[in-house]
Regions:
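Sec-dependent N-terminal signal peptides
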Residues: 6-10
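Post-signal-peptide N-terminal segment of Sec-exported extracytoplasmic proteins
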Residues: 26, 31-71, 133-142
Length: 155
């Protein structure tokens, strides 16, 4: 009976260590807002595709992102919430995580709406939020991130 308890404890610790290792790998990843593209438009809303590049700098270990919740702004005005789930980044690679957004026209003022519809070079997109990775025993651990800018403010 004691052997089974010890074996169960050892198995639990090994699983927890693996989860902590993948979480550490995620903390060492680089994040960049790669693209924000207008994909659809109609009288009531605009559709966008947001691409976030996640670079795993570790040469041997994968990194795992449980989920990400963030806010996308354009020219310092709130645009939409961005959510990503269950992303695995293989060692020494870049993963382009994609999120599709539908934003009501009422979210934009007329000037900003015109700039977006023309894909103006004066647009400045910014993404911030919280990424969550799975820690020991399935506990989600939050880490605030500033993924960065794409557009006019990104020199």
């Amino acid at each position: 009976m004691k052997k089974w308890g010890f074996l169960l404890l050892l198995t639990g610790l090994l699983c927890a260590c693996a989860g902590v290792q993948e979480a550490q790998n995620l903390a060492n990843c680089k994040f960049a807002l790669r693209n924000v593209e207008l994909t659809d438009y109609n009288l009531s809303s605009l559709g966008f595709e947001v691409v976030i590049a996640i670079t795993n700098l570790n040469r041997k270990q994968p990194a795992s992102l449980k989920h990400f919740e963030g806010k996308l702004t354009v020219n310092d005005e709130y645009m939409a919430d961005v959510t990503l789930k269950d992303i695995r980044i293989e060692p020494n690679t870049v993963k382009n995580a994609r999120a599709k957004l539908t934003v009501p026209m009422s979210a934009f003022n007329n000037k900003l709406l015109g700039l977006i519809s023309m894909n103006s070079a004066t647009l400045d997109y910014h993404l911030t939020g919280t990424m969550y990775f799975e820690g020991p025993l399935g506990v989600e651990i939050p880490v605030p991130v500033n993924i960065g800018r794409y557009g006019n403010g990104n020199f």
